[in-house]
Every structure is written in C-alpha cells, then in structure tokens.
C-alpha cells in the first residue's frame, strides 16, 4: 500500500487540466457542459466526482472515465480509513444467529 494519501480528483482537475490551459471554473464548466457551481464544488473538494463528470472529463481530455472514478474511490476509501476506529461492527461469524441455523437457511429466510 502506498504511503501517499490519495488526492481529491477535483485537485487533479484544477491543477492538471484547468490551470495548464489557462482555464477558470467558468470556462471549464462551459466546455464540460456543467454548471459553474458543479465544477467549483468539485475543484474545491466540496463535492466528489460523479460517474457523469468522469465521462465528461474523459471525453474532454481523452483517457478513461474509469481512471477518474478510481481516483475518487481511492480518495473516498482513504477518508473512511482515517475514521475507521469509530466504525463499530460485530463480526458476522461471531453473531449467535449465524450459528443457530444451517448456512443455506440464512439466505433463504
């Protein structure tokens, strides 16, 4: 596992797509066919990358919509892992009900 923390896809859009081409949010939004607010929320990290935006970015820049979504997934997972100590669960294998019925019955109830 990499020790580098994943970058929010919006930062990638801003730093590697908009800025090098001298584009602001208004121009970028127009080219992508989205609202200024939608792109602003993405590049400032207030919103995540949607599958639709991933397709738009891939069409506008070339490349893969799946790669854009992988960036979002990596970022989201890293964010959840930061707070994983607050997530409390009971392992299913230790749950009493799991031992009281045959496995096949668990999924047919």
Predicted segments with their positions:
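The DNA-recognition helices of helix-turn-helix-type DNA-binding domains
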Residues: 35, 46, 61, 72-75
